[in-house]
């Protein structure tokens, strides 16, 4: 679908130079002389390579139309995942690296979204918010928040380390915001 360059947003998938690119970041620029343009950081969905591209704000871009379908994660190994379509219960096997570094969030029976283009699966997304248990945290020293940060490092059940507020203890369940791998809130019981 053709759109204007000024319509580009992070998360869009563009057809550019006979390949599909995911727009990661954008920056609108209005130089003193000449027309406005958009500087986009993009990721090639097939190779994973990063690329920077300029688009004229009034120029045309071609946005790819992707099909989204929800699948339930059943099981996996080091390189492959088996998932089941929630509508027709068809099971398929996909490469684990299609999730990239977000595969650490996979849990049994988790619903993930697979994105396909012309019948070929090109990308996958985990939910934006995932609840995980804290396995280990650093001890908090009384008065620590006065002189330093009010965050400490916690090890989660998926062996990931993230910064959490000092009131989080080992055994607590927290919600992690997966797009930037950050603490969101303490899980509600």
Swiss-Prot record:
What's the protein name? Elongation factor P
What's a GO cellular component annotated to this UniProt protein? cytoplasm
The alphabetized UniProt keywords are: Cytoplasm, Elongation factor, Protein biosynthesis
> Which SUPFAM superfamilies does the record associate with it?
Nucleic acid-binding proteins, Translation proteins SH3-like domain
Q: Which family does it belong to?
A: Belongs to the elongation factor P family.
Q: Which GO terms describe its biological process?
A: peptide biosynthetic process
Q: Which gene is annotated as encoding this protein in its UniProt record?
A: efp
- Chief place of localization: cytoplasm
> What species is given as this protein's source?
Ehrlichia ruminantium (strain Gardel)
């Amino acid at each position: 679908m053709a759109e204007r360059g000024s319509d580009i947003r992070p998360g869009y998938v563009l057809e550019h130079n006979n390949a599909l690119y995911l727009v990661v970041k954008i920056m609108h620029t209005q130089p003193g002389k000449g027309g406005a343009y958009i500087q986009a950081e993009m990721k090639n969905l097939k190779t994973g390579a990063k690329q920077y591209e300029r688009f004229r704000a009034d120029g045309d871009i071609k946005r790819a139309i992707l099909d989204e379908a929800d699948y339930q994660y059943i099981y996996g190994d080091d390189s492959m995942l088996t998932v089941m379509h929630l509508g027709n219960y068809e099971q398929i096997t996909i490469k684990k690296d299609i999730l990239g570094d977000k595969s650490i969030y996979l849990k049994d029976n988790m619903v993930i979204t697979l994105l396909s283009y012309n019948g070929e699966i090109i990308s996958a997304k985990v939910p934006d918010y995932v609840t995980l248990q804290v396995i280990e945290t650093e001890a908090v020293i009384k008065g620590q928040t006065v002189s330093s940060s009010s965050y400490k490092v916690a090890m989660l059940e998926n062996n990931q380390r993230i910064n959490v507020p000092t009131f989080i203890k080992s055994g607590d369940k927290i919600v992690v915001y997966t797009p930037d791998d950050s603490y969101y809130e303490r899980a509600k019981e």
